[in-house]
Amino acid sequence: MVEGMEIDGGLAVQAEGENGQTHTRVSAERLRELVRGIGGAGDHWLVLQRIPDLPDVFAQVWHETGGDYRLEHRLGDEGFFGADLADADRVADLLTGWARQEPGWDMGVTWEPVDLGPREDVPEPSDDARRTVEECVRRRLRCGYDTRAVLTQIAEDHLVGSAMEPLSRAQAERLVDRLWLERVAEQAAWEGVTDPELLTRAFEALDASGITARENFTCCRGCGLAEIGAEREGARGFVFFHQQGTESAAAGHGLALYYGGFDGSEDTTTAVGHEVVAALHAAGLSTEWDGSPARSIVVEPLDWRKRLVG
């Protein structure tokens, strides 16, 4: 896996459309299809962020059928630029160059600055408030599943009802962006495929085989067991780990997986358990399980280095 340009054959970007669909690590061909497809009601725009996401670094395009394409890209504090283009394929080529970070990708286009307005003056929170919220955000960053938007909401809400003054939205955004970039810099030194990525491969294989496999699913075991059946029709079985399990793995412990069938049979649960263990071993992970349908499957040892997405 290579960070920065292309990942496993896909562009190192996440594309989100007005239609509510999100596409992660799309190919250049798929990105072209997405650009060509916008323009209708409820589907006018597409926003691309890098993987991992970087604060105020993105590219976006807006289009209404019959009109030009409005293409914009932001370079963090270095500027925000836009241009009007007539051809969807030209837009797709530019976005692909942006995604690959090709030198000179933006050449040949007349870019105009986009006015960002005055910069907001954001006061610093108290030291106690900052330290308390930082501890919470760092813990969630180690888990690795939250987006910057989710983390910002968590930071804003964390002190509500406490004796300390809660962070404002702007304070929360600034704190999260700073800690996010620290984690991005840390993970840039990681080499090769990490254990969470091996886990994802195993879960993808299980899901493709008819076993509903979900990562970081619900808050706890009880909620997971109550909700997993609604995730997919016609599944042969399920496996998941919950958010508390993620936190435990990120703290250096093993990861408990919960599994079973939908017919209430111990034989089905045991059979699904064996399939889960086989998929994990095929991916290169180790497990502890005695074969009992009453016991969870524990993935360990586990080095929890989950790369951020955004």
Q: Could you say what each language-model-derived stretch is?
A:
Residues V2-P52:
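Negatively charged, low-complexity tracts enriched in Asp/Glu with abundant Ser/Thr
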Residues E29-L31, D195-T200, T269-V276:
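Well-ordered, non-membrane alpha-helical segments in soluble/globular domains
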Residues I7, L11-Q14, N19, E64, ...:
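Intrinsic disorder/low-complexity detector
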Residues E233-V239, V299-G310:
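Short, structured secondary-structure boundary patches
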